[in-house]
Each structure stands twice: as structure tokens, then as C-alpha cells.
């Protein structure tokens, strides 16, 4: 086995494959060629593969328990200190549909001790903690967490809070912007203190998927895993299609047992048996089946949005890059240098492409903050950024209308 092994505790994050928020309104005066589109817009999806992929997305660890248990010893941390209150505090979610009716009733009556690690173990036994797989056994008469691992859903699924804050029905494909991957990994007793300081500095909804290779830290916003059908290249910097990033994250970040190789970044990992590669087609199919959510009723001004569409296609020049039904030019083989759009160049400089992809805009309202680094907290900030960088000289009214149109996508 030849393996370049990550040195920093990688994380509970970036598992799904993609990044759909890189540059909310990119310019395209200069472009770089990339490979042709990988997915046809009219490609039909396979229902059988979708069902398989859903189980993989939600419940498959790819054998990463070896890392999360044997290396990070997170099973010890959870057993000793992670109560449901603490888990919710770092953004973990509970799938209400996995809870028996009597448990829901007891929760509603306040009869469940949410400050007890025993309750956490009970939730793990029910497979109710989104993105966490735990194996609980009775050891010397005590319930004991003996193995733990993570799945794609940890970072790329949340809940609708329909039962209580942090507890509800799964929303697969939504980025868990409450999740603090750095803080979670920093709980490990095996992570050096200097590394813990870096990880604790990322904050909720942020993760760096390359720190374990180059030692730098420029964390990214966790991307959604919905609205990807027909998009040729995934990730903020368009290294490859969905399955490329799924393999990269599953092997190098989740530390699953599988193969990944990319000579462009000098990574070559071979492990036997390969528990990742055979599952990539079904996982990809499920992710491509996840549609971007429609804007909630009443979330935008209809008349203003109608005017904003004209601004989008005209004075703001957004449609020069955010074009077609997917609102991106990546399928045309275009990428954009950081200086074109006023983006921080540091992350792009660490990648093979050295440039950013134009972000598809469907479901935009549902996943702030914006840009790869989260530097724009609102759509107003996005519009303001491009008005300054591109010297658009939009009026205040045009800016407001443009924001309302973006909310409709």
C-alpha cells in the first residue's frame, strides 16, 4: 500500500461532493479551459441507484471507524463527555423519524435526560444522530461505545427542527451550517494543542479540506449537495465531477478505506479492500436526485424580483457568467481567476486549477453565507461586493431589486 496519510485530524466535514456557493455573481471577461461537461442536462437518473445511494449517503462510513476510533479516540470522548446538549451545541442533529413514538412522547414531557451521555449512546443505538454511526455493546454490565465513524450526512444534511431545535426530519443535501467540524475534531485527546487552536478558529459551517496535506488553513463554507444534476464540475475550484470529490473526501478527509489518486495534487492512496470506489455511482446518483429547494412562500417581493431579473440580465451583467438553466458557465469549460471577481486568492492558490468556478444559483436563498470563504453574510453583501469590484454603479433601487430576484432562484 502506498499512501500519503493526512497529518492533521481531518474532519467531520466536506463529505458530499461539491461546492455550490463559490462565487455568487462571477464575472467572465477572462476564462480558462477545463475539461468538457461530464453530465448531460437531460440525463435520466436510475431509481434503484438512488435508493442505494441514499443509504450510502446517510449511513455508510466507508470503514472510517479505524480513524475516528483508533486514531482520534472519539468513542472515548463521546462516552465520557458528549451529552445531547453538548452534541446539539456543536451542531449535531437528531433524526426525529428514527425515534420510537414512546421516546418522542418522553422527550415532549421532558422526561429524557439531555445532560446524560447515556442518552447520547441510546440515540446512537437508534441510528438517530445524523451523520454519526456508533456501535454500542454491553461491557461489564455497562453500555459502552466501542466504535464510531462518520458519514456524508454529517456535513451535508440537516433537519427541519419540526420537533425541537436540532431535532426533526432530515433535509439531505442541505449544508449543516450549525456544525462546527473543527471544534468536534479538536475534542480528540490525540490532536496536538497547536492544531486544536487552528481547528477551533474555523467556526460553524466552515472546514478546510486541504489542511492535512499542505498545513495551511483557509476554511471554506460547507457547500450544499443539492441542485447538482447537469453541473459538469464540482467544488469551488472545479477539480472534477461529483464522484471525484466524493472519493477525495471519503478517502482523505473522512479517512475511509478506499482508493484515491490525483497526480495534479500529488496524492496517491491505495487500500485493500476498497470500500469507497464501488459505491461512488450510487452515491452520485442520489446526490444528483436532490433538487434545489424552492424559495419559501412570501420570502421575496414579486414585483421587485421581476424588475431584478432585468437588472440581472442587463446592468449588473450577472448573466454573462450565470447563464442557462443552471446559472453557471462551468459547463462551457470556463473558470475565473480570483482577481476577476475580487475573491480571496489564497484557497485557489492551493488547488490544481488556481481559479474559481461560477456558482450555480439554484437554492441560493437557503445557504448563506456566500462566496467560498463565507465573506458575504447576505445577498445584499454579494450584490454590494460586485457593484464595487465591477464598478457597476447600480442604484440603490437596482440593488434591492436584484437581491429580490436572487431570492427567487
Q: For each predicted feature, which ranges?
A:
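Periplasmic c-type cytochrome electron-transfer domains
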Residues: 2-8, 23-409
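Bacterial N-terminal signal peptides
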Residues: 12-24
Amino acid at each position: 500500500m502506498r499512501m500519503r496519510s493526512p497529518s492533521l485530524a481531518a474532519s467531520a466535514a466536506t463529505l458530499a461532493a461539491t461546492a455550490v456557493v463559490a462565487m455568487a455573481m462571477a464575472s467572465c471577461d477572462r476564462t480558462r479551459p477545463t475539461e468538457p461537461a461530464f453530465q448531460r442536462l437531460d440525463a435520466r437518473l436510475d431509481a434503484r441507484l438512488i435508493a442505494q445511494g441514499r443509504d450510502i449517503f446517510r449511513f455508510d462510513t466507508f470503514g472510517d471507524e479505524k480513524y475516528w476510533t483508533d486514531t482520534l479516540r472519539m468513542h472515548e470522548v463521546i462516552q465520557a463527555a458528549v451529552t445531547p446538549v453538548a452534541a446539539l451545541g456543536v451542531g449535531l442533529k437528531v433524526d426525529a423519524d428514527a425515534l420510537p413514538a414512546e421516546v418522542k412522547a418522553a422527550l415532549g414531557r421532558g422526561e429524557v435526560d439531555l445532560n446524560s451521555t447515556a442518552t447520547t449512546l441510546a440515540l446512537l443505538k437508534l441510528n438517530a444522530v445524523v451523520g454519526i454511526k456508533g456501535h454500542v455493546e454491553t461491557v461489564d454490565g455497562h453500555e459502552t461505545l466501542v466504535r464510531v465513524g462518520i458519514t456524508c450526512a454529517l456535513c451535508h444534511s440537516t433537519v427541519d427542527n419540526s420537533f425541537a431545535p436540532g431535532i426533526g426530519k432530515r433535509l439531505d443535501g442541505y449544508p449543516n451550517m450549525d456544525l462546527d467540524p473543527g471544534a468536534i475534531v479538536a475534542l480528540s485527546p490525540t490532536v496536538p494543542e497547536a492544531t486544536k487552536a487552528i481547528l477551533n478558529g474555523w467556526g460553524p459551517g466552515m472546514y478546510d479540506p486541504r489542511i492535512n496535506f499542505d498545513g495551511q488553513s483557509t476554511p471554506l463554507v460547507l457547500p450544499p449537495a443539492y441542485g447538482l444534476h447537469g453541473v459538469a464540475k464540482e467544488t469551488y475550484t472545479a477539480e472534477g465531477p461529483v464522484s471525484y470529490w466524493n472519493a477525495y473526501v471519503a478517502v482523505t478527509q473522512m479517512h475511509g478505506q478506499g482508493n484515491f489518486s490525483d497526480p495534479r495534487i500529488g496524492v496517491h492512496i491505495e487500500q485493500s479492500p476498497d470500500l469507497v470506489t464501488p459505491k461512488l455511482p450510487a452515491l452520485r446518483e442520489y446526490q444528483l436526485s436532490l433538487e434545489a429547494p424552492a424559495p419559501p412562500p412570501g420570502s421575496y417581493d414579486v414585483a421587485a424580483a421581476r424588475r431584478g431579473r432585468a437588472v440581472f440580465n442587463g446592468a449588473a451583467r450577472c448573466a454573462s457568467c450565470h447563464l442557462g438553466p443552471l446559472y453557471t458557465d462551468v459547463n462551457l469549460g470556463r473558470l475565473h481567476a480570483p482577481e476577476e471577481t475580487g475573491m480571496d486568492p489564497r484557497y485557489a492558490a492551493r488547488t490544481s486549477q488556481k481559479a474559481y468556478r461560477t456558482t450555480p444559483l439554484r437554492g441560493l436563498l437557503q445557504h448563506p453565507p456566500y462566496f467560498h470563504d463565507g465573506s458575504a453574510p447576505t445577498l445584499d453583501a454579494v450584490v454590494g461586493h460586485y457593484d464595487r469590484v465591477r464598478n457597476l454603479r447600480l442604484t440603490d433601487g437596482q440593488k434591492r431589486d436584484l437581491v429580490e430576484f436572487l431570492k427567487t432562484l
